Regions:
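Glycine/proline-rich active-site loop of Rossmann-fold NAD(P)-dependent oxidoreductases
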Residues: 145, 158-160, 171-181, 207, ...
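Catalytic helix-loop patch of NAD(P)-dependent Rossmann-fold dehydrogenases
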Residues: 89, 123-170, 191-195
Length: 343
């Protein structure tokens, strides 16, 4: 069978670099879209066909697209802080330009990585793909919602074969954003829980996610469908944190604040940061408080049933691998942008 050429946007980011390894390991030719001068350390010596480009620049996308069979779209602005205009330009318009270029060049499948956060923080467990995706007060979430909504309409009119993946809270080796910040806070005695850590969460180990991405790019039944992807666990934040601390050899956090207090503090902090025009997010944001203080949990029954997905790594292995990578890692600034789409 002829080898496919898979274009991965955001290839030098956390999820993108893992996706590149996964597709290369299965025999695909991986073409990576990277911005000029961007950090490529996560790619190591992986043999890739790197192309300079930007998802907001149609000409650069057209230059990278000839010969591509599958697009895996991971590039985006992923942060809980920043102006709407930036999120719209990158996450909405960038997706539109990429999909249009893929269609113009005869791409056979377009795998769009969205976010489980589109379903909101409704305090529910076992949420499914057909549940509402309300307008969000958070620029990141709303931009991903609008991008996915547009993409479904475009795929119907253009005929572009499209699959959407909505991951939960992604973690794993080389994650220098949220999880590393959380661990740094625990090390410093500042980490803790919202409401005692009893809200259910949706850990999504990055190599489990890339296994789902491969199925989305390969399985004939995937086209035209959206799939939620997590590790499939019924787990709360306290249990996840305790398992994480055990893997890292850290003392478990003892601090906890009520949900209402967390929201009040986050609202005040965000208002103050906006007032002074701060570019970085405060340590507490409403997004983070809702993510950690309300049930935010999803069923993966659909992807199990339709694509035969089974998460290949259990939580113990995932945390061991993640802990090993954190020995020398330094956290990014709070609210830092990422080359990946995250939950």
């Amino acid at each position: 069978m002829a080898r496919r050429t898979v274009l991965v946007t955001g290839v030098n980011g956390f999820i993108g670099s893992h996706a590149a390894r996964a597709f290369h390991g299965r025999g695909d030719v991986v073409r990576g879209l990277v911005r000029q001068g961007s950090d490529r350390r996560l790619l190591g010596d992986l043999p890739l066909d790197l192309r300079h480009g930007d998802i907001t620049d149609r000409a650069s996308l057209d230059a990278a697209m000839p010969g591509v069979d599958v697009v895996v779209h991971l590039a985006g602005l992923a942060s809980d802080h920043g102006p709407w205009e930036r999120f719209h330009a990158v996450n909405v318009v960038g997706t539109q330009l990429l999909a249009a270029s893929a269609h113009a060049h005869g791409v056979r499948r377009f795998v769009h990585v969205s976010s489980a956060s589109l379903h909101g923080f409704a305090g529910r467990r076992h949420m499914t793909e057909d549940m509402p995706m309300p307008v969000s007060p958070y620029a990141y979430v709303e931009s991903k919602r609008q991008a996915e909504q547009w993409l479904w309409q475009w795929s119907q009119t253009s005929g572009l074969p499209t699959v959407v993946i909505r991951p939960g809270n992604v973690f794993g080796p080389d994650d220098h954003t949220f999880l590393l910040q959380y661990v740094a806070a625990i090390r410093n005695g500042q980490g803790g829980y919202i409401g005692g850590g009893r809200a259910w969460t949706c850990p999504t180990y990055v190599e489990n996610l890339t296994a789902a991405l491969w199925l989305a790019a390969e399985h004939p039944a995937a086209v035209g469908e959206a799939f939620l992807v997590t590790d499939g666990l019924d787990i709360d934040w306290r249990t996840f944190t305790e398992r994480l601390c055990e893997a890292l050899g850290l003392r478990r956090p003892r601090l906890s604040i009520p949900y209402w207090l967390g929201m009040a503090l986050a609202t005040a902090l965000e208002g103050g940061y906006r007032l002074v025009g701060a570019r970085r997010a405060p340590l507490l944001t409403r997004y983070r408080i809702q993510n950690g203080g309300r049930d935010y949990h999803f069923s993966i029954d659909k992807i199990r049933r339709v694509l035969g997905f089974v998460p290949p790594f259990d939580l113990a292995t995932a945390l061991q691998r993640t802990a090993a990578s954190m020995a020398t890692a330094r956290p990014a600034a709070p609210g830092a942008a990422s080359g990946d789409a995250v939950g």
